[in-house]
Amino acid sequence: MSSVEHCRFRPPRTGHLLMWEVTRYCNLACAHCCTDASPLLRRTPAVSTESALRLISELPALGITSMTLSGGEPLLRPDLPRLLDLAGHLGVGVYLNTNGYPITRRRAEALRAAGVRMVTISLDSHRAEDHNTIRRNPSAFDRAVRGIRECLRAGVPVRVSGVITPDLLPELEEYVAFVAGLGVPRVVLNTAFPVGRARRNPALVPSPDPGLAAHLDTLKHRYAAGGPQLDHSLGADEGGSNGAGRTAAPATCAAGTRILHIAANGDVSGCSWLYKLDPGRFRLGNITRSSLTDILRRVPAMRASLPRTTEGCPLTDVEAETA
């Protein structure tokens, strides 16, 4: 049975969803990391400050009004304040995905001052032991929770992101209740996709469950009157479920047309998952050698090699490696 049957992305109806992995360096080495990020990698970013600033300068003319920065751990990129400053000056909205570990009160206040639109903090369990095991760090849970609280205190919009593992599956209600108790207004749940380190840890990838989306939608409606807004993007068969207010997965492939991805080495692709599956095939160019404007001229040729609908996506045949 295929691991992925529907697109995981919820791209905007117009414009692009730009996801930029600004570094592969990370203070953690999570068992399910799709980028194989690690503290053993070099801390100096592969994309220089000059190249990064040049890229951001191009975005308004391309009609790209926001971007999501991830990693690795984006808060550990030394020049991040300069990137945020330029983005703010140009009116490019910034969303940030982080493990929460580096967030102190001072850093949370700096993120608010920089105008970051939302910080998504990863929390994979309401149980410290389980989260720390996945994140491979005995302090990961406490630091993530501290990061959540500091962002909330500073007035930074916060979302919690959780990866549904087989262990978390029977405890989803307790998990959502815990996050709600922290005062978090938004929660998004996903399943691990078998690329990167997750491909070598198949026990973290649950079997497709047609009833999971319905269960999550039940939780979503339970909290609709008060509590966190719950969303999910499972990448597995969601059984046609599409809770009110949740943008449906695209029926047609959005790679390169409404989705753009930039890897930590500067490679540009139309879809992060396709790129991680086969970088050579899906690489459009590299921002250290070409402008994004020039790179995007290659999208039509890439699109010609892909099926029009998501049913024929190359990712549908990806399976987790067996031990």
Task: State the predicted function of each range.
Residues M1-A114, M118:
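Conserved alpha-helical substructure of the radical SAM core
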Residues M1-T14, A248-P250, D267-A323:
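Flexible mid-to-C-terminal extensions adjoining Fe-S/redox cofactors in radical SAM and related proteins
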Residues Y25, A29, D36, G256, ...:
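Cys/His-rich metal-chelating microdomains
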Residues R42, A113-A114, S122-D124, E129-A255, ...:
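Radical SAM enzyme [4Fe-4S]-AdoMet core and its adjacent flexible, acidic
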Residues R77, T104-R105, L169-L172, S269-G270:
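Short, well-ordered alpha-helical microsegments
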Residues V92, I259-L260:
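Generic short beta-strand
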